[in-house]
Amino acid sequence: TLLILNRQFYRNTDTVSVLDVGQGQCITAFAGDATVMIDCGNTYNLSDAGDLAAAYLHSCGRDRIDLLVLTHLHEDHADGVPRLMEMYDIETLILPEERGDTLYEEILDSAARHATEVITAKGDMTVTCGDIGMELYAYLNGGENERCLMSRLSIGSYDVLVTADAPEKLEKRFVNEHDTDGIETLIVGHHGSKYSSGDELLGAVDGSLAVISVGYNNYGQPAQETLERLAAYGYNVLRTDEDGTIEIRIGQDNG
C-alpha cells in the first residue's frame, strides 16, 4: 500500500530524473501529464537502455513519451532508442542530422514504423510540451563532440542545463551567446570529462547541483580535476555510478 501511495505521489510530482544507465545518458522530465526524455543510451552489454528507460517510465505511471530529444548520435546517448520505440509510443523526436550514420538510420527507420514525428534540428529551437519548456541550442559544425544539441529544460522557475558531450570550446560559445541566469542544475558534460565543465561555464552558471551520468569506464571519468572545479564553484555533486538513478522533485512552487 505504501508503494502504491508513493507512486501516486510521485506521479503527481514534477520531476527531473537522471537514470542510471552506466556509461551513458538518459534524462526524463515529468510535469503534469507531459513526459519528455533527453537521450537514451548505453548500459553496455548487460541490458539495453531502452528496456531500463521503459521500466522506469512504467514504474512512474507514464504510458507515453511526448518528446524525445537526442543531443547527438553516439551510442552512449542513443543506442537504446530503437528498443524504447518498440515498447513506448513517442509522439515527437528531435535530433541533429547525421546522414550515413548506422544508428541514425536505424532510429529513423524505427520512427517511421511507429509513426513518430521526426524533426531534424537545423538551428536553435524553442519547444513547449505541456508544462515543460525547452530551449535547444544547435551546434552542428566542428569536431565530433562539437556537433550536438545543448538544451535548457524548464519546469516553472526550475531550470536544468544539459550540455551533452560539449567540450570547453563549445561551452564558451554557449556562455557568450546565451543567458545563463536562473539555471539551478547542471547535467555535467561528457560524463565528467576533464575537457568539459570548464571555468567559463561554471562561472556563468550560478547553479547549486551538478549531476554526473557515468558508469564503469576506461576514460578516467569523472576526472578528478572536473570534480575539483565543481567543488570550487560550490556545487553539490551527485553521480549515477555511486547514487544510482537521481530524482529531482520540484516543489509546488516549481522551484
Residue ranges and their predicted role:
Residues 1-255:
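Non-globular, low-confidence helical/coil segments that flank catalytic cores
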